[in-house]
Regions:
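Hydrophobic alpha-helical scaffolding
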Residues: 153, 157, 181, 185, ...
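Residue-level marker of positions within ordered structural domains that often coincide
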Residues: 2, 200, 239
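A glycine- and small-residue-enriched flexible loop/hinge signal that marks low-structured segments
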Residues: 1-174, 211, 216
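Extended, compositionally biased non-globular segments
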Residues: 163-219
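Compositionally biased, low-complexity/repeat regions
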Residues: 208-265
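Alpha-helix initiation/capping motif
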Residues: 34, 38, 116, 184-186, ...
């Protein structure tokens, strides 16, 4: 996936598979002279790779277990699958800050790359996911390859994008049986009611903050109805990863005074 031609093909194939389904792809920036050998060169390497899809995530450098070197995208894919499995196969949680079973982050030739958190955050801000050593190596980053060109939550955040795609694919699989049924009010209401029950379950389990599906007349003009097309509209709000947790501290003089004087005269 570090080859621009391959990366372009992978990104092109993530949307409308068989005309219906969406997915995500994980790409690597080459960890050698054809890509980037230092973190300051990663932004340019990402641009040369052509990684810009909201359905793609980009990784740099590589991970090593002893002398064995692995593409970071492969390790991230395994971490993503493990995170999903731990959450009932619902992709609402980011794989970032999860343990990676590696002993070092390296270039292709095995040269160690030791990124501190600020350097890793810089890469995250360029739409690149990496790994840091924080009491053990952890995957680090939440943004898709489309960031920072887009800040739309459903296109920027990998976990949100994956939830959108998963929900959209499930909708197709669930209601495919309804295709070619009479397009009457009963059909529309059955889809709306059934999907809202499913969505309410997501909210109750804290998979997302809100979920509702509606049928709007203005999105279903007579030309569409005559063409056999019905359109529903889903409003959903997966939770955003808590990427920054800030604690404000100040000195409590009243507490000191009360402790020493009892608050009296």
């Amino acid at each position: 996936s570090h080859d621009p031609v391959v990366a372009a093909a992978l990104q092109a194939k993530t949307g409308k598979i068989n005309g219906n389904f969406d997915c995500n792809t994980y790409l690597d920036i080459a960890a050698d002279s054809t890509g980037a050998t230092v973190y300051t060169a990663v932004k340019t390497a990402k641009e040369k790779l052509g990684a810009s899809s909201n359905h793609a995530a980009v990784f740099w450098p590589k991970g090593a277990v002893g002398e064995k070197i692995y593409c970071l995208s492969a390790m991230a894919a395994a971490e993503t699958a493990a995170t999903d499995a731990a959450n009932g196969d619902v992709p609402y949680e980011s794989p970032s800050n999860k343990d990676l079973k590696i002993t070092a982050t390296v270039l292709d030739d095995g040269t160690e790359v030791a990124l501190d958190q600020e350097q890793a955050n810089l890469l995250n801000g360029q739409g690149v996911i990496t790994a840091i050593n924080a009491n053990g190596f952890k995957l680090w980053g939440n943004n898709t390859a489309a960031y920072p060109s887009t800040t739309d939550p459903k296109d920027r955040w990998l976990a949100v994008r994956r939830f959108f795609d998963w929900d959209g694919n499930n909708f197709i699989l669930t209601y495919f049986q309804k295709v070619d049924k009479p397009g009457n009010k009963r059909l529309i209401q059955s889809i709306v009611d059934s999907q809202n029950i499913i969505g309410n379950g997501y909210v109750a389990r804290d998979y997302c903050a809100g979920y509702r599906l509606e049928f709007h007349a203005e999105e279903n003009p007579i030309t569409d109805l005559l063409d056999g097309k019905l359109t529903t509209h889903t409003y959903l709000a997966p939770y955003i990863p808590a990427e920054k947790i800030v604690n404000i501290r100040e000195y409590d003089t009243a507490a000191l005074e009360a402790a020493l004087t009892g608050g009296g005269e």
